[in-house]
Amino acid sequence: MLYVNQLEYPHLTYNHNTLNGGPPEGRNSVKTSGCGLCCASMVVDQLTDQTLPIEDCVRLSEETGANQWIGTSMKVLGKALSERYEIDFSYTNDIDEAIEHLAKGGRVIVLVGGARDGYADLFTKRGHYMLLLSYDGEEFCILDPALSDEKYAEEGRVGRVRIKPPFLYSSKEEIVLAAEAQKTRYFLFSRRKI
């Protein structure tokens, strides 16, 4: 199973936030802003007989306008994936719909937010995409494209997830809390029936 870690791409430029003059200073690489791209590459690998190298995913995002805002618009990139690969795409804010989708063999990209009043950030200090692989009734199995030895050792994060690289395990409650500030939370992908 392909795992793509954005931290391995500090020199791969990602020109995003194009509607507002480009990326913030120091945040113009896949390492800093490519979590959605990494998740998209993993989805294509897992649901099709094709690959989408991260360099090609950067180009796809830029060609389709998924890069017009900070990071990546998964609504735009997901639609592009659906058009170019044999993948069905939709989105929801219902965690139970996302869980049902996983149970049918699909994949879910979740958009989590950062810290806010009453919530200590678990997965990110900003917006961040991660790939949900499965749910066993207690925990999600997750591929976090920004997984590092240090990330979940930070104060406030210790003990809230289990890690067996490259996999991360987290409760439904943690995912719901982490995603609740996002306008669109769960992006559903499945192999298209032929």
Task: Name each region found by the language model.
Residues 1-7, 11, 16, 82, ...:
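Noncatalytic regulatory segments and standalone regulatory/sensor domains
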Residues 1-67:
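Active-site-adjacent structural segments surrounding the nucleophilic cysteine of cysteine proteases
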Residues 31, 36-40, 73, 77, ...:
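Stable alpha-helical elements in mature extracytoplasmic
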Residues 40, 61-68, 92-103:
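Short low-complexity stretches enriched in small and charged residues
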Residues 42-50, 80, 84, 101:
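Structured segments of extracytoplasmic/periplasmic soluble domains
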Residues 64-92:
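Mid-length scaffold segments of soluble, non-membrane domains
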Residues 91-147, 151:
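Active-site-adjacent substructure of cysteine-protease-like catalytic cores
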